[in-house]
Amino acid sequence: RYNKYLKIKAGAGRVVDGIINLPESFKEANEAFMFVDVAGETPEDGGPQIMLFADLGIFKLLCQLSDPSMLLEYVPEGLQKLYNYKKPQRDDLITTLRAYLDRNLNLSKTAQDLYVHYKTAVYRIEKIEKLTGIDFDNANEVLAVRIGLVVYKMIENYNKDFI
């Protein structure tokens, strides 16, 4: 059983041949670690979150950038509005948006994950829709928002003082 107050996160690079190739695996482990909060799944038992470089998939493309803030121009305007919203409410709305997308737009599961009443989750999603103009029925728009959240998380991990 795991301590629920202790969060363990790790990134792992690929297995390499010879000590000479360890720096490459270490670099991959760091890149995987950047995505542990974004693409890694939290185990049901609260155990450690581990992101393997081999499992990054499309996120490997984003690793190629030396400065993730270069990606800001690709973040949807509505999501930028949400990130520019006043701080206390902004954090709740972003957390709700992430949970909503992670749960495939299922409000019941979103409410459960956030330990809030169903109507609270509905209210927050409606507020996000009104504030950002995001159309959750448009798959392309939802994908753009999901990628935008990844970009913001990368920047946050890259430079803790950015947001």
Give names to the regions the model predicted:
Residues 1-163:
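Cytosolic nucleotide-utilizing catalytic cores of signal-transduction proteins
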